[in-house]
Structure formats: structure tokens, C-alpha cells
């Protein structure tokens, strides 16, 4: 069915945010998300079957869907996409044919965080550093979670945006204090090259805690990043000091990225760690450390605002924005 016919028949967009364990789906109608559902990837041999089941659950016909955008964890190229943390494979041609689609767009999952940053409302953001965003400049999106995602969002005018994904999580971890250096040495002994992601991720938080305990002669009481965070929230001094150091390192890495990209449009923090410990993050030294550096670079960063993204489904929203812009570009 051609695009015009399907749209005249009430064609809808469908968006998905697919991780290793769960797949989140929603309809994209009138530039808004509707009918959000979460399905377990393990329950479906193929992603097409998950889409069909999602539509059946919400009482929507496959025939009414003309466009799909899926956020996928990993680098997205022109070839088939193989998920690294589950058994699914997306063959673009087969996927389009089975579901009768006119458009199929696959985007990197962290890129959707950047797309989402162009559309989030005030109730989906918490400002953690004051400043004045420049509307015509790039925005930086950074998110420690399973790894350390980094990307930027460029305004093109007319409400259009371009997302520039990168591998900023793999820059060298900056060392600016004796404690930094001691922790860095512990990371180097484990991994060799010490990227920012080695510290600023879930595994990184646990590694920093274990190394910190060894340096200070303190017994290790946590075996996961979640447990480190729980200890910190319960008042454990060692875990709390590690969480503080994590936030300070994030400030330096984010500040360096702003200097590199020229992201005077502001910084948006996402990922699974900072929003979980938002009150502790606000109370940390992040805001001061972000611009605490040399005279020239510190002045450049002084007025850059920082927000934490607290939207419940930013990946789905970002996929919807990416799909909408692609369709609008086609006319």
C-alpha cells in the first residue's frame, strides 16, 4: 500500500525502545505518545511478533501502522541489526514486508535521548545547575548507566534538529587530584586503558567503591552498583564518598565535552544512575566542579545550565521525534 493511501486510511506511527530484557512500544499520534506497553523480549522469537502482540493488546490493527521507529542498543548501520543482549535480529526488508510498512527507521538508543531533549516539558526536567541556555547552540546529552552515553543535539532552525552520536564515553578519564590518581591507578590495574566509562557507569561505580575500600582499608559491603547506592543512601560513609566522587568526575567529563562541542545550549543528564539518586546529586559538588578549572575554560562554562531528565519514557519520546522529523523531511 502506498504512503498516501495508508495515511488517508488513518495511518499511525509506532515507536519502540528495545533493550536487552524489555521492549517498550507506543503509538505515535499527533506528535504524542499513546498506549505505552512493556513486553519481555524473551517471550518472542522475533521483534515483528512482539509488535503484532503489542498491537493486539491495545486493540489496534497492523494495517493502520505505516511508519515505525525503533531505538536499538548499539551502533545502527544500513545492514541488519543484531541485538547484543538478546536473541532478536531485525532484517529491515523482512520487517517492513511482514508489517506492511512504508517507513522503518532504526536509531541508536542513546540518540533517542538526544531527540527527547528537544521536546521534554518543564515537568520532565530538573535543573541542577543555573545558567542561560543559548538557543542557537548545541546541547550536550550525557548519561551514565550500563555504559556512558554521550551525544549532542544541533538546532537546524524551523524546529528541526540533528543528532550527532559519538563515542565520548571512551575518552580518557581526567585526573585532577591525588585521590583521582589513586582511583585511576586502581582502574588501570584492572583494565589497562582507563576511559571515562570505566568510572562513570554501573560497573564503574562498583569498581570505584571496591578500589576505594582497598585504599582505605575498609571492608567491602556491596557487590553491585545498586548496593553501593543503597549503602550511600543509608548513610554509609565509604559508599557516600564514592558516590560523591562519581558525581564530581561526571562534572569534569561533562564540562570537557561542552568545551569540545561548544554546547552552550545546555547539558542534559540521563541514564539509570543520576535520576535514581537525584536528591543526593543535587546536594553534591557537581554544579561547582563543572566549571571549576582554568580561567578561560571556567569562564566559558560558567553560564551553562544543566538539567536531569526525569521523563518516564524518554526513549519512546525520542523515537517519536526522530520519526516525525524523518516523515516531515519527506513531505
UniProtKB/Swiss-Prot annotation:
It catalyses: D-glucose + ATP = D-glucose 6-phosphate + ADP + H(+). Keywords: ATP-binding, Cytoplasm, Glycolysis, Kinase, Nucleotide-binding, Transferase. One of its GO terms (biological process) is glycolytic process. Its EC number is 2.7.1.2. GO terms for molecular function: ATP binding; D-glucose binding; glucokinase activity. It is an enzyme of class 2 (transferase). InterPro entries: ATPase_NBD, Bacterial_glucokinase, Glucokinase. ATP binds at residues 16-21. It is found in: Cytoplasm. Its main location: cytoplasm. Gene3D superfamilies: 3.30.420.40, 3.40.367.20. GO terms for cellular component: cytosol. It holds the Pfam family Glucokinase. Belongs to the bacterial glucokinase family. This is Glucokinase. It comes from Pseudomonas aeruginosa (strain ATCC 15692 / DSM 22644 / CIP 104116 / JCM 14847 / LMG 12228 / 1C / PRS 101 / PAO1).
Amino acid at each position: 500500500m502506498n504512503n498516501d493511501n495508508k495515511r488517508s486510511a488513518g495511518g499511525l506511527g509506532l515507536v519502540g525502545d528495545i533493550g536487552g530484557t524489555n521492549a517498550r512500544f507506543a503509538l505515535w499520534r499527533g506528535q504524542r505518545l499513546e498506549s505505552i506497553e512493556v513486553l519481555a523480549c524473551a517471550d518472542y522469537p522475533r521483534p515483528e511478533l512482539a509488535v503484532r502482540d503489542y498491537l493486539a493488546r491495545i486493540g489496534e490493527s497492523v494495517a493502520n501502522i505505516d511508519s515505525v521507529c525503533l531505538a536499538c542498543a548499539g551502533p545502527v548501520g544500513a545492514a541488519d541489526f543484531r541485538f547484543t543482549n538478546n536473541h532478536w535480529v531485525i532484517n529491515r526488508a523482512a520487517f517492513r514486508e511482514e508489517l506492511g510498512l512504508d517507513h522503518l527507521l532504526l536509531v541508536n538508543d542513546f540518540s533517542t535521548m538526544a531527540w527527547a531533549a528537544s521536546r521534554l516539558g518543564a515537568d520532565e526536567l530538573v535543573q541542577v545547575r543555573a545558567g542561560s541556555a543559548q538557543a542557537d547552540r548545541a546541547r550536550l546529552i550525557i548519561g551514565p548507566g550500563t555504559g556512558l552515553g554521550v551525544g549532542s543535539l544541533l538546532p537546524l532552525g524551523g524546529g528541526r534538529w540533528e543528532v550527532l552520536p559519538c563515542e565520548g564515553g571512551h575518552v580518557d578519564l581526567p585526573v585532577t587530584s591525588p585521590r583521582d590518581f589513586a582511583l585511576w591507578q586502581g582502574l588501570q590495574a584492572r583494565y589497562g586503558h582507563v576511559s571515562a566509562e570505566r568510572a562513570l557507569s554501573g560497573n564503574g561505580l562498583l569498581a570505584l567503591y571496591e578500589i576505594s575500600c582497598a585504599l582505605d582499608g575498609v571492608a567491602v559491603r556491596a557487590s553491585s552498583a545498586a548496593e553501593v547506592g543503597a549503602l550511600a543512601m543509608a548513610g554509609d560513609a565509604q559508599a557516600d564518598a564514592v558516590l560523591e566522587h562519581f558525581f564530581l568526575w561526571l562534572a569534569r567529563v561533562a564540562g570537557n565535552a561542552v568545551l569540545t562541542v561548544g554546547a552552550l545550549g545546555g547539558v542534559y543528564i540521563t541514564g539509570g544512575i543520576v535520576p535514581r539518586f537525584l536528591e543526593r546529586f543535587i546536594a553534591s559538588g557537581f554544579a561547582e566542579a563543572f566549571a571549576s578549572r582554568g580561567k578561560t575554560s571556567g569562564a566559558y562554562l560558567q553560564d551553562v545550565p544543566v538539567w536531569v531528565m526525569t521523563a518516564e519514557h524518554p526513549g519512546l519520546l525520542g523515537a517519536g521525534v526522530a520519526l516525525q522529523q524523518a516523515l516531515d523531511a519527506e513531505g
